[in-house]
Amino acid sequence: MGSNEVATGDPLATLDWNKGEGLLPVIVQDADNLRVLMLGYMNAQALAVTQQRGEVTFFSRSKQRLWTKGESSGNVLRVVSIQTDCDADTLLVQARPHGPTCHLGRTSCFPSAPGQFLGSLDALVAERERERPHGSYTTKLFEQGIRRIAQKVGEEGVETALAGVVQDDDALLGESADLLYHLIVLLRARGLGLGDAAALLESRHQ
């Protein structure tokens, strides 16, 4: 999906604008790691502008006008999808942030939750795959190709298993961390992410 293409669907046509006197709360989530980035409000015009431009645009309750996130700082939020909740009175926008979302220079306006680091690491690996910064170990792996990455996953998997067999907990944790990292790189080398694997696990659980 291009930056100006927003997946909306029919549910947006039945939004309940009356509950909030013409405003709907909007949760913005990182499309790659699913971290909640911020909360804002949209009126119908802000939603239309967001759909048209592909950049998250809110209605400012204090300034009483539309404002596009990042219009001053350049830290815009590129829209990937827009969904509504079951009551059609709240929006969930998945976006890709270009720079920090919080005005304090933080990634999110909310503190990190335990276990959220893996999602952030997945997003970082995806960024490394796109930008290939010089001197990065991750860049080196991508440039060596899928066979080398797969080999590293195999090596780390064996080392993790051996650490478990000998009951060396410190080694087990260290090797598990290495395995997770290289597995993320392998997934990204195939155009996949941790979210895809997690979604499959979730479908099996249901």
From Swiss-Prot:
Parts forming coiled coils = none
Family matches, as SUPFAM superfamilies: all-alpha NTP pyrophosphatases, HisI-like
Q: Which GO terms describe its molecular function?
A: ATP binding; phosphoribosyl-AMP cyclohydrolase activity; phosphoribosyl-ATP diphosphatase activity
Question: Which segments carry the region annotation Phosphoribosyl-AMP cyclohydrolase?
Answer: 1-117
| Record-linked InterPro entries | His_synth_HisIE, HisE, PRib-ATP_PPHydrolase-like, PRib_AMP_CycHydrolase_dom, PRib_AMP_CycHydrolase_sf
Region Phosphoribosyl-ATP pyrophosphohydrolase: start and end of each range? 118-206
Report the GO terms under cellular component. Answer: cytoplasm
Q: In which pathway does it act?
A: Amino-acid biosynthesis; L-histidine biosynthesis; L-histidine from 5-phospho-alpha-D-ribose 1-diphosphate: step 2/9; Amino-acid biosynthesis; L-histidine biosynthesis; L-histidine from 5-phospho-alpha-D-ribose 1-diphosphate: step 3/9
Q: What is this protein called?
A: Histidine biosynthesis bifunctional protein HisIE
